[in-house]
């Protein structure tokens, strides 16, 4: 069986609506694509980096919960996982910081 491998950045998107945080979800373009493929039943792995912190653990758990292989993920003991702030407008379009 063939497997799709995604390579990219990992971030935790903190979602704001009316300037208040309402959700936090793992993201990054390649990560989102790989999770979508895995949810569609396609075997998938992801290669990226997270920090050795709570955010990194949350991202790894999210990938595992979505049946994405994480054996090649780099866990940086010195680095911190990346965060992104996404502010939604009235039509739920995001403006990222």
Residue ranges and their predicted role:
Residues 1, 22-26, 47-50:
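Short acidic/polar alpha-helix capping motifs at helix-coil junctions
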Residues 20-36:
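Short catalytic helix/loop segments, enriched in acidic residues and glycine
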Residues 1-21:
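Positively charged, low-complexity intrinsically disordered leader regions
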Residues 10-13, 33-40:
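Beta-barrel outer-membrane channel/assembly domains of diderm bacteria
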């Amino acid at each position: 069986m063939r497997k799709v491998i995604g390579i990219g950045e990992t971030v935790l998107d903190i979602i704001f609506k009316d300037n208040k945080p309402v959700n936090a979800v793992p993201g990054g373009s390649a990560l989102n694509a790989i999770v979508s493929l895995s949810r569609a039943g396609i075997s998938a792995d992801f290669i990226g980096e997270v920090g050795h912190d709570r955010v990194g653990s949350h991202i790894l758990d999210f990938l595992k919960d979505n049946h994405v292989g994480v054996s090649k993920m780099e866990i940086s003991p010195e680095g911190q996982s990346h965060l992104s702030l996404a502010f939604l407008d009235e039509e739920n379009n995001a403006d990222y910081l």
